[in-house]
Amino acid sequence: MTVVRPTGDDLVAMLAALANPLRLRIVATLAGGPDYVSHLAREIGVSRPLLHMHLQRLEVAGLIVGHLELSDDGKAMKFYNVADFDLHLNATVLAEAAKTLTKSDPEKGSAAKEKP
């Protein structure tokens, strides 16, 4: 089995997406199987617009995948499922990922990537 390690930017996006309790609940719910937006919103107890915002963030981070399916009455329904990922973190993985960061550190400002 080939181990693929995320780049620093991918790792930051994934961890930032999972740092939100609601997004963590969304991933946990979808781990049980694919679900469509309206049902998922009712299941989790949030509005569809709020759910859409969080689903987009998770999709951009590569943690979930969305696809359209037609219902029996011909209505398009957006389903989401968990993407195939297996994330293992330790100091070595973090150090390797940090070497590949392309985005500046917001805490250090735009000068973070500049060399003297």
Model regions and ranges:
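Residues within the DNA-recognition helix of helix-turn-helix
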Residues: 54
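Long, low-complexity, charged/polar intrinsically disordered regions in eukaryotic proteins
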Residues: 1-7
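Short, charged/polar surface micro-motifs in flexible loops or helix N-caps
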Residues: 33, 57, 85-88
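Alpha-helical residues within the helix-turn-helix
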Residues: 42, 59-60
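Conserved segment of winged-helix/HTH DNA-binding domains
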Residues: 72-116
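N-terminal helix-turn-helix DNA-binding core of bacterial DNA-binding proteins
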Residues: 10-50, 69, 76-81
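Beta-hairpin "wing" of winged helix-turn-helix
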Residues: 60-73
